[in-house]
């Protein structure tokens, strides 16, 4: 895989995609399909059993999305990424993967309004408590932490406040307690790379 340095180049050419093997076109094709043909029943069984990597169904994986995910991971400096339909879907996806009913997260008070609605209404209906900490003092996250805390949450540059979230400080507190920090990086990896800060 090429090691590009500039975000513009990574955005256009990052990930592993170089050209279409059949046509040699350098633009990523848009695959408008929901399903894929399997070589045989054994291959299908291996794919569905997650013993083999490959396309099963577009909702799970699509070659176009695969390129997008690899480029986003490269831009963020991460190992992998998952493309979802919206920022709200990404936030919900992250939290629902670490929490179950009875668990809680500690979130920054500086949040986009839609996220506040997700946290106060949707997650509470699923039995997930959201505790709100003022990020001006990162220790506020630790004060609200207990044995059922599964994640800390913040926005790198929250809308509409634009007060930069103390990523490193909250990540350090999280590491001390074995709690992951989830960052909504809507501001983009061109402006901020949360993984570089903890």
Predicted regions and their residues:
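N-terminal "arm"/small-domain region of PLP-dependent enzymes with the aminotransferase-like
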Residues: 2-62, 70-71
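Conserved N-terminal alpha-helix of the aminotransferase class I/II PLP-enzyme fold
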Residues: 40-92, 114-121
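Conserved PLP-enzyme active-site core in the AAT-like
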Residues: 2, 11-13, 18-19, 81-198
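Short, basic and Ser/Thr-rich N-terminal targeting/leader segments
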Residues: 25-26, 77, 126
């Amino acid at each position: 895989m090429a090691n590009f340095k500039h975000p513009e180049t990574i955005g256009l050419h990052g990930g592993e995609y170089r050209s279409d093997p059949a046509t040699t076109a350098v633009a990523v094709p848009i695959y408008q399909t929901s399903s894929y043909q399997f070589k045989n029943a054994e291959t299908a069984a291996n794919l569905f059993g997650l013993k083999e990597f490959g396309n099963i169904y577009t909702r799970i994986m699509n070659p176009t999305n695969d390129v997008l995910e690899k480029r986003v991971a490269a831009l963020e400096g991460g190992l992998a990424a998952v493309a979802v339909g919206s920022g709200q879907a990404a936030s919900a996806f992250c939290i629902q993967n670490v929490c179950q009913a009875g668990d809680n997260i500690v979130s920054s008070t500086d949040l986009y309004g839609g996220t506040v609605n997700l946290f106060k209404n949707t997650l509470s209906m699923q039995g997930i408590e959201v505790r709100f900490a003022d990020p001006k003092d990162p220790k506020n996250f630790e004060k609200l932490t207990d044995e059922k805390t599964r994640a800390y949450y913040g926005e790198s540059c929250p809308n509409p406040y634009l007060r930069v979230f103390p990523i490193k400080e909250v990540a350090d507190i999280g590491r001390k307690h074995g709690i992951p920090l989830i960052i909504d990086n809507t501001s983009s990896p061109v402006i901020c790379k949360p993984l570089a800060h903890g």
